[in-house]
Amino acid sequence: MLIDLKNIARRKQGKEIIKNISWRINEGEKWMLYGLNGAGKTTLLNILNAYEPNTSGELTLFGMQPGKIGYSADEVRNQIGFVSSSLMERFKDGEIVRDVVISGIFKSIGIFKEVEAHHVEMARHYLAQMGMSEFESQYYGYLSTGERQKVLIARALMGNPKLLILDEPASGLDFIAREDLLDALEQLYQRQPELSVIYVTHFVEEITKDIQKGFLLKDGTCYKQGEIKSVLDSDTLSDFFNRRVSVLHQNERYSLFLKR
């Protein structure tokens, strides 16, 4: 077990942003986290990343509990690879792609420590895994959004994380770029079956066959969680959206339609 949340809540300025959330993530599990804007996803991710405390409930992150002996927020973050659109914007256009990836070993924006030969080899290894070897010496600013996402995923893998959190990685990508990214992720999942993943999205079309579990977040609480087929179900999502929708599962992918 990597993550165990028991009835956690987070209150800000007198308002509960998330409440009564219980969620357990085991080694090797690939999860979808799905919720509309304002559902509390950002707050939940901040708690998982040890950037925000829970105000009630019991939280265990990689065997450690906040406030207990042995807990270290830095150690929690060392176990997590996190990729988000806000992270993408923090790197300068003039940085070399290889250096962006290497910075992941130091958990820094930019490199401020001595780079060793094995760091360079690691960066090349993960760039190759993401299909980005040819871009190693290029400027980060020359890359497309999809290419930058692959670079940031390679960067996240530099720390050998137990949990990879992908916060809307396909946001803003066209169809081809999205499918290229999802193909690269599928290959990653196959190569590292022990890696746990939380894939955050607004679109069921991004859910690939290796993501076998789903968590629906609505109004700050868990609406439903479990096996992906039971979560991405027409009746379940119709209730979730309070609109009549239909889910099509074909060729190991999902599509969502509004019934009219």
Where are these regions (language model features)?
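Catalytic Walker B motif of ABC-type/P-loop ATPase nucleotide-binding domains
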Residues: 164-168
